[in-house]
Swiss-Prot record:
Oligomer status and interactors: Homotetramer.
Record-listed Mg(2+) binding positions: 71, 139
Gene: pyrG
Enzyme Commission numbers on file: 6.3.4.2
Start and end residues of each Glutamine amidotransferase type-1 domain: 291-542
InterPro entries: Class_I_gatase-like (IPR029062), CTP_synthase (IPR004468), CTP_synthase_N (IPR017456), GATASE (IPR017926), GATase1_CTP_Synthase (IPR033828), P-loop_NTPase (IPR027417)
Superkingdom: Bacteria
Protein known as: CTP synthase
Chain positions recorded as CTP binding sites: 13, 146-148, 186-191, 222
Keywords, comma-separated and alphabetical: ATP-binding, Glutamine amidotransferase, Ligase, Magnesium, Metal-binding, Nucleotide-binding, Pyrimidine biosynthesis
One MF annotation (Gene Ontology) recorded for this entry: glutaminase activity
Length: 543
C-alpha cells in the first residue's frame, strides 16, 4: 500500500518546505522504505522554463527533459532518486490539459469547472505512477491562504477521503518567531495558519515549526492544544549550519518516528544515518579551504545557481576542504575593467550557464584570465560557448568570432540549434515559434576521447548528462580551433555536436555543453566537480 504525505506551508514563504520534504524522504529511505517525491506549483506558467531566473531561481532539468522547480534538485540530492516530468505540475499545466480535453469533447458537452474537473486532474497527477512506492511525499508550493493554492488544497482534502485517512497524512510547516523584547517564541502565527488550513477542510497531523531555538515543552503543549495535534507531533525545525544536517536534526526531534506511528508502522528501530553523519562531519571539519570565483549573469539571486553551489560543496566534501564562493556579476568586468583585482585571489574560476548577450564579454574576459594565468577553469553550457569564442578570438585569428544568439556575425562560432535527435526521433524548432520546451532538454549520451583529461576524470569514455540549451558550438570550426591547442574531447555519439573542450597543456581547463551540477549528490559528488576542486586545492598550495 502506498502512503501519501502532503506537505504545506504557512505564515510566510521561503521557510524550506522543499528541504523539509527531502529530509523526511531521506529519513524514510534510511529505514528501508521506497520513496517518491512530487511538487505541485500553484502558478499559471505551464512550467518555469520561460521564467526569469530573478523571478523563479534555477530551472532544474530532469532526465526526460522536464523544466522543473529547483526543489526537485533538493529531492534528487537528498534521496538519489531521479525525478521525472510527472513529479512537477503547475496550475498552468493542469488548466492547459483540462482545456485541451474540453476542446476534444472529452467532457461530452458538460460544463467544465474547477470542481470537479480541475481537482480531479490534480488528483490524477498525484496518484498516477505511484503503485511501486511505500511513500509518496507531495509538496504544495506557496503559502496556505493564497488564492492560487485553493484548487490544490481542495484536491488534497478530497484525496484524504478517497484514499482514507490511514493512507494519507498532512504535515504543515509554519514559523515560530522569537520576539527578543518579550523573550519568548510566539505561537499565534502558527495557530492562525493552521486555522486557515482547517477552514478549507484539512486538519494537519503534524506541525513542523521553523525556529532558531528549541521549543519549550509548555509552548509545544500550547501549540498542540490549539492546533488539535499530539504534542509529539509538534516538531522543531531548527536552524542548522548546513541543509545536510536536517535529516539528523529532524530525527532527533522524532519526526520520522511520528510519521511511522501515524501510519501504524514499526518505529522503534533506529534509521541508518551514517552517511549523513559523514557528510555533516566533512562540511563542519574541513582540512583546508579554497576560493572559487563564479562569474555569472544572475548573481543578484543566488537561487539561480542553486545546484551549482551545491555541486561545488560536494566537490569540497570529496576533497575534505571548505569551498568559499565569490559571486561576481560578469558585467562588472565590462564596466570597471577590474578583472585582475577581482580574480587575483581565486584558486579556480567557473563560468556557468545563461542566456543572452548581457554580460557575455565579461565572461569571455574571465575565460581569458583563467587561460593566460593557468588557473583551474570550468565552463558550463554558455560558459563552454564563451570559452570557444575566446579561443577563436585570441588564438585562432578570428577577432569577429561570436554567437548568433547576440546577432548576425561573420564568424558564427556558436549557432542556433534547429534540429537534434532524441532516440530515433528528429526534433525540430521553428524560427518564431514558442520558446517553452524548445531547447535541447534532458539527458543525452556523449563519447569522450580516450586519453583525454575529461575521460580520465570520468574514468570512462561514454557518459550521459543533462542538457538545457538552444545554441550549440559550431563543429565546422573544430579543426581550426584544435590547431591552437584547444581539444574537442567530447562529442555526441554521431560526432556532430561538441560536448566537451579542454586545453591539455593547461593546469586544469575543461568546458562542457551540459549541466553536470544537476547530477551531483553529497554522497556521490560529480567527478567534474571533484576534479575541479582537487585542481583548486593544488592551485591554493602553489600560491
Amino acid at each position: 500500500m502506498t502512503r501519501f504525505v502532503f506537505i504545506t506551508g504557512g505564515v510566510v514563504s521561503s521557510l524550506g518546505k522543499g528541504i523539509a520534504s527531502a529530509a523526511l524522504a531521506a529519513l524514510l529511505q534510511a529505514r528501508g522504505y521506497k520513496v517518491r517525491m512530487r511538487k505541485l506549483d500553484p502558478y499559471l506558467n505551464v512550467d518555469p522554463g520561460t521564467m526569469s531566473p530573478y523571478q523563479h531561481g534555477e530551472v532544474f532539468i530532469t532526465d526526460d527533459g522536464a523544466e522543473t522547480d529547483l526543489d526537485l534538485g533538493h529531492y534528487e540530492r537528498f534521496t538519489g532518486v531521479h525525478a521525472s516530468r510527472a513529479d512537477n505540475t503547475t496550475t498552468g499545466r493542469i488548466y492547459s490539459d483540462v482545456i485541451a480535453r474540453e476542446r476534444r469533447g472529452d467532457y461530452l458537452g458538460g460544463t467544465v469547472q474547477v470542481i470537479p474537473h480541475i481537482t480531479d486532474a490534480i488528483k490524477d497527477v498525484v496518484v498516477t505512477g505511484t503503485d511501486d512506492y511505500d511513500f509518496v511525499l507531495v509538496e504544495i508550493g506557496g503559502t496556505v491562504g493564497d488564492i492560487e493554492s485553493l484548487p490544490f488544497l481542495e484536491a488534497i482534502r478530497q484525496l484524504r477521503n478517497d484514499l482514507g485517512h490511514a493512507q494519507t497524512m498532512c504535515v504543515h510547516l509554519t514559523l515560530l518567531p522569537y520576539i527578543p523584547a518579550a523573550g519568548e517564541l510566539k505561537t499565534k502565527p502558527t495557530q492562525h495558519s493552521v486555522k486557515e488550513l482547517q477552514n478549507v477542510g484539512i486538519q494537519p497531523q503534524m506541525l513542523l515549526c521553523r525556529s532558531d531555538r528549541p521549543i519549550p515543552d509548555n509552548e509545544r503543549r500550547k501549540i498542540a492544544n490549539f492546533c488539535n495535534v499530539r504534542p509529539e507531533a509538534v516538531i522543531a525545525a531548527l536552524d542548522v549550519d548546513t541543509i545536510y544536517a536536517c535529516p539528523i536534526s529532524y530525527h532527533n526531534e522524532g519526526m520520522d518516528q511520528e510519521v511511522l506511528r501515524y501510519f501504524d508502522l514499526p518505529y522503534d528501530s533506529k534509521p541508518d544515518l551514517s552517511r549523513w553523519e559523514k557528510i555533516v562531519h566533512a562540511i563542519r571539519e574541513p582540512e583546508g579551504e579554497v576560493r572559487v570565483a563564479i562569474v555569472g549573469k544572475y548573481t543578484a539571486l543566488l537561487d539561480s545557481y542553486k545546484s551549482l553551489a551545491e555541486a561545488l560543496l560536494h566537490g569540497g566534501i570529496a576533497n575534505h576542504v571548505k569551498v568559499k564562493l565569490d559571486w561576481i556579476e560578469s558585467e562588472e568586468f565590462e564596466k570597471n575593467g577590474n578583472i585582475a583585482e577581482r580574480l587575483k585571489d581565486a584558486d579556480a574560476i567557473l563560468v556557468p550557464g545563461g542566456f543572452g548577450e548581457r554580460g557575455a564579454e565579461g565572461k569571455i574576459q574571465a575565460v581569458r584570465y583563467a587561460r593566460e594565468h593557468n588557473i583551474p577553469f570550468l565552463g558550463i553550457c554558455f560558459g563552454m560557448q564563451m570559452a570557444v569564442i575566446e579561443c577563436a578570438r585570441s588564438l585562432a585569428g578570428l577577432p569577429k568570432a561570436s554567437s548568433t544568439e547576440f546577432g548576425p556575425t561573420d564568424e558564427p562560432l556558436v549557432g542556433l540549434m534547429t534540429e537534434w535527435a532524441r532516440g530515433s526521433e528528429m526534433l525540430r524548432r521553428r524560427e518564431g515559434g514558442d520558446l517553452g520546451g524548445t531547447m535541447r532538454l534532458g539527458a543525452y549520451p556523449a563519447k569522450l576521447v580516450p586519453g583525454s583529461r575529461v575521460a580520465e576524470i570520468y574514468g570512462r569514455t561514454e557518459i550521459r548528462e543533462r542538457h538545457r540549451h538552444r545554441w550549440e558550438v559550431n563543429a565546422h570550426y573544430k579543426d581550426r580551433l584544435e590547431k591552437t591547442g584547444l581539444r574537442f574531447s567530447g562529442l555526441s555519439p554521431d560526432g556532430v555536436l561538441p560536448e566537451v573542450v579542454e586545453y591539455p597543456d593547461h593546469a586544469w581547463f575543461v568546458a562542457v555543453q551540459y549541466h553536470p551540477e544537476l547530477l551531483s549528490k553529497p554522497f556521490d559528488p560529480h567527478p567534474l566537480f571533484a576534479g575541479f576542486i582537487a585542481a583548486a586545492v593544488k592551485e591554493a598550495h602553489r600560491k
